[in-house]
Amino acid sequence: MTPLSLIDPALSEQDNEHWLRFVALLQQSIAEDLQLPLLQLLLTPDERTALGTRVRIVQELMRGEMSQRELKSELGAGIATITRGSNSLKAAPPALKIWLEAQLLSADKP
């Protein structure tokens, strides 16, 4: 498997450092079962809702049963958000797509 790059080309060097610090903090919070209070501290209710919507967008795009316009109506998301999700999914590493499929498309997942 090809190692994933830790550097996000969309971010500046300093922003990458901040992002990686957040990821490390989140990983540590998961190890200590503190991820929910951490995310509630760092994210507003609207940001948490937006993340949930983005997960649903990725899930439905992977399922492939609805058009982007149908997703817009179903989820109340903007077409630009759905298009970004679609483009990001196309560019995602194959290993991530396989993992997401197992997480989001298995019959027993909510």
Curated annotation (Swiss-Prot):
Signal peptide: none
Entry keywords, A to Z: Cytoplasm, DNA-binding, Repressor, Transcription, Transcription regulation
GO MF entry, a single one: sequence-specific DNA binding
DNA-binding region of this protein: 68-91
Pfam family, one: Trp_repressor
Keyword Cytoplasm included in the entry's annotation: yes
Record PANTHER family: TRP OPERON REPRESSOR (PTHR38025:SF1)
Recorded family membership: Belongs to the TrpR family.
Complexes and interactors: Homodimer.
UniProt-recorded name of the protein: Trp operon repressor
Organism encoding this protein: Pectobacterium atrosepticum (strain SCRI 1043 / ATCC BAA-672) (Erwinia carotovora subsp. atroseptica)
Gene: trpR
